[in-house]
Every structure is written in C-alpha cells, then in structure tokens.
C-alpha cells in the first residue's frame, strides 16, 4: 500500500553512506524530513536533484529540515557519489527494497532495471505524518522543489 498525504509515514532504518544506521523516527525528533527517493546514484537527473537540495541547505536549515536521499544502490556507491558531488545530506541504501515497497515507489522496469526506486519526494512532519507527496512516473523529471519548500514552510 502506498504512503499517502495525511497518513503516518512508514518508519524505517537504513544504512547511510558510512554504514551507519539512520532511523526515520529518530530524524523526526530533530525536525521535518524530506525523503528523496531516486532511481540511481551517479545518474544525471539524480545528481541534479541531490545537488539542488545540497545548494538549498541554508534555506532548509532555517526550517530545521533534513533531506534523506534514498536509492537501492549499495552504501559503497552512495559514499563515492556523496564525496564526488560534495553532498551534505545522508544518502541511504535501500538495497533490499523494503522501504521503496512500503512507500509504494517501486519502478518495476526502467530501461531494463527491475524494481528500483521511482523518483519521489515526501515531506514528513515531526509527528510522522506525510504532508507532501510527489511521485514522478518519468525519472527524467525533477521534483517540484517549490512545493517541497512550501510544504516545509507550512509546518
């Protein structure tokens, strides 16, 4: 079942690029969270998306928001990608695909790659409630950053 606006966000723990566990409910104690699901590390649009969030860090910090980038890549690949692009947010490995299933963002076939993440963003408030959701069927498109920021500003 897909996670929808107004529903409780499925909690999860995933390993970050440094092989450290990151739990959504723990992150929410610090402020709202943007979950940024992406098809693949090092791909063009995914890099543009994460670098856009990176470059918005000051604005997001003012809203006490944390961005968590999530792909099905290994934490080894995510660590190399984070370093190569000088990213400041945690990148999480959903290698076993449990979280993309819980959020309903599994792409069954993208140019021959099976069961990777669709490009999707969720804004989760500090109570764990989903306040914004955007799932893109075309992975070449970027999320609507303005709507993400508007959802955060409304909290």
Predicted regions, residues:
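Chalcogenol-based redox active-site neighborhoods
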Residues: 1-155
């Amino acid at each position: 079942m897909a996670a929808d606006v107004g529903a409780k966000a499925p909690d999860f723990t995933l390993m970050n690029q440094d092989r450290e566990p990151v739990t959504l409910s723990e992150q929410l104690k610090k402020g709202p969270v943007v979950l940024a699901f992406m098809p693949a590390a090092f791909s063009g649009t995914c890099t543009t998306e994460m670098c856009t969030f990176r470059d918005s860090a000051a604005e997001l910090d003012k809203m006490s928001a944390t961005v968590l980038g999530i792909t099905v890549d290994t934490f080894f690949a995510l660590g190399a990608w984070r370093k190569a692009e000088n990213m400041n947010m945690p990148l999480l490995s959903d290698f076993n695909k449990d979280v993309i299933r819980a959020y309903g963002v599994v792409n069954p076939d993208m140019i021959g790659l099976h069961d990777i993440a669709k490009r999707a963003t969720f804004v989760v408030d500090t109570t764990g409630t989903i306040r914004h959701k955007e799932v893109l069927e075309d992975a070449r498109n970027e999320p609507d950053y303005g709507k993400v920021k508007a959802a955060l500003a409304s909290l």
